Curated annotation (Swiss-Prot):
Listed Gene3D superfamilies: von Willebrand factor, type A domain
PANTHER family: PROTEIN VIAA (PTHR36846:SF1)
Keyword terms: Chaperone, Cytoplasm
Record organism: Escherichia coli (strain SMS-3-5 / SECEC)
UniProt keyword Chaperone present: yes
Name of the protein in question: Regulatory protein ViaA
Record-linked Pfam families: VWA_CoxE
The family this protein is said to belong to: Belongs to the ViaA family.
Length: 483
């Protein structure tokens, strides 16, 4: 079967001109003009897609098959070119019959040309072939235009669908032209309106939590280069958190006598239900003689000191990818879950704007992974946002997964971010020592985004930076009131 590309070559039909005309008509369509005016950042991204469209159209024309009737007519034309004038005269009745049988547009004109001349001369032979060639060129051009029109309709439908999706997501995920271009590339997947509306929903939630958005932006800008100190010696007040022993619920350290009802031993609590021993229970409660669990831990207090002011010049460092671990335990459900997902969406926005990678790991009893900055980033983001936080907490496995990822060459300059309430068991010593080694030797930075004011200091002290966003009701009301 003859291909359209071969036919174009045989008849010297310029398909490039037809393709360019089609693309110009597509870009000038009213739908795209309105979209470009509304979303100017996406105009450059769509324009950058033109070479891909051009290549796809070339491929479509190259692979298209010529109809059998036109193929047979072209073969007859090629054979007729090889005939001498006497041979052509002999074959002419068969040629005319073939053209009539194939319903060729040239058939009627060919018969009229022959009937108008009683003698077939060499000049008439040449004229017959020239006009036949023109007829074939018209048919080939029409076939090209039909195929390109079909492709234009399909391409316009695809572009309109992607424009609708990108237009919805552009205010949420595109912070500059780089992000707009990457967002347009991601929109090539097959998504339904209800799917990406989930991203819109969490984007609106993020806008309602400006403090959370600012926190993500501060974390994204936190990597700075070597500082150059200056010799200015003014004093300033400096506040820092210091760790000290305290009775916080981290681990059981033994038994003690106290009046702490929340930490009573079960036998002591049982005496309260016995009438004869009830007064004895109250006496021991007043005298702080009840047997209770003794808990050991650490807490933090603010220490105020004075130190010389040090002015520094900062040279911005290249920023690496994000590896974000999200705690999906039951305690992270509800408002915590919304904040954690919205925070990851904010990091995705930063990653798209700065051409960084954003890799999400959900940890509870198992680890689930998503890459939000890849070609399928929007689909991955939708799957991530669809997850429910109902598991347990296995922080050690989370750190092991992070460390395994940091060993690979492509993640050597990554920053690790752990989003949790940090109400969990202490980390094993081998995990702690490995994290410290990565911080010391490879300069990897570990960030904690604490969603609770009750996170265990013993866990959180391993991080380079702690970004606090208290999701308690009191803090939520205070933030709303300050706005």
């Amino acid at each position: 079967m003859l291909t359209l590309d071969t036919l174009n070559v045989m008849l010297a039909v310029s398909e490039e001109g037809l393709i360019e005309e089609m693309i110009i008509a597509l870009l000038a369509s009213p739908q795209l003009a309105v979209f470009f005016e509304k979303f100017p950042r996406l105009k450059a991204a769509i324009t950058d897609d033109v070479p891909r469209w051009r290549e796809a159209l070339r491929s479509r024309l190259k692979d298209a098959r010529v109809p059998p009737e036109l193929t047979e007519e072209v073969m007859c034309y090629q054979q007729s070119q090889l005939l001498s004038t006497p041979q052509f005269i002999v074959q002419l009745p068969q040629i005319l019959d073939l053209l009539h049988r194939l319903n060729s547009p040239w058939a009627e004109q060919a018969r009229q040309l022959v009937d108008a001349n009683s003698t077939i001369t060499s000049a008439l032979h040449t004229l017959f072939l020239q006009r036949w060639r023109l007829s074939l060129i018209v048919q080939a051009t029409t076939l090209n235009q039909q195929l390109l029109e079909e492709e234009r309709e399909q391409l316009l439908s695809e572009v309109q669908e992607r424009m609708t999706q990108s237009g919805q997501l552009e205010p949420i995920l595109a912070d500059n032209n780089t992000a707009a271009g990457r967002l347009w590339d991601m929109s090539a997947g097959q998504l339904k309106r209800g799917d990406y509306q989930l991203i819109v929903k969490y984007g609106e939630f993020l806008n309602e939590q400006p403090e959370l958005k600012r926190l993500a932006e501060q974390l994204g800008r936190s990597r700075e280069a070597k500082s150059i100190p200056r010799n200015d010696a003014q004093m300033e007040t400096f506040r820092t958190l210091v760790r000290e022993p305290a009775t916080v619920p981290e681990q059981v350290d033994g038994l003690q006598q106290s009046d702490d009802i929340l930490r009573l031993l079960p036998p002591e609590l049982a005496t309260l239900g016995i009438t004869e021993l009830e007064y004895e229970f109250y006496r021991r409660l007043v005298e702080k003689q009840l047997l209770t669990y003794r808990l050991h831990g650490e807490s933090w207090r603010e220490k105020v000191i004075e130190r010389p002011v040090v002015h520094k010049d900062y040279d911005e460092q290249p920023r690496g990818p994000f590896i974000v671990c999200v705690d999906t335990s039951g305690s992270m459900g509800g408002f915590n879950e919304q904040c954690a997902k919205a925070f990851c969406l904010a990091l995705m926005r930063i990653a798209l704007a700065e051409n960084r990678r954003c890799y999400i790991m959900l940890f509870s009893t198992e680890i689930v992974r998503y890459e939000l900055s890849g070609p399928q980033g929007i689909e991955q983001a939708i799957r991530f946002l669809s997850q429910r936080f109902r598991g347990g907490t296995d922080l050690a496995s989370c750190f092991r997964a992070i460390m395994e990822r940091l060993q690979s060459r492509e993640w050597f300059d990554a920053d690790a971010v752990v989003i949790s309430d940090f109400i969990a068991q202490r980390l094993p010593d081998d995990v702690t020592s490995k994290v410290k080694e990565l911080q010391r030797v490879h300069q990897h930075r570990f960030h904690a985004v604490a969603m609770s004011a009750h996170g265990k200091p013993g866990i959180m002290r391993i991080f380079d930076h702690i970004w606090r966003f208290d999701t308690g009701m009191r803090s939520r009301l205070l933030r709303r009131w300050r706005r």
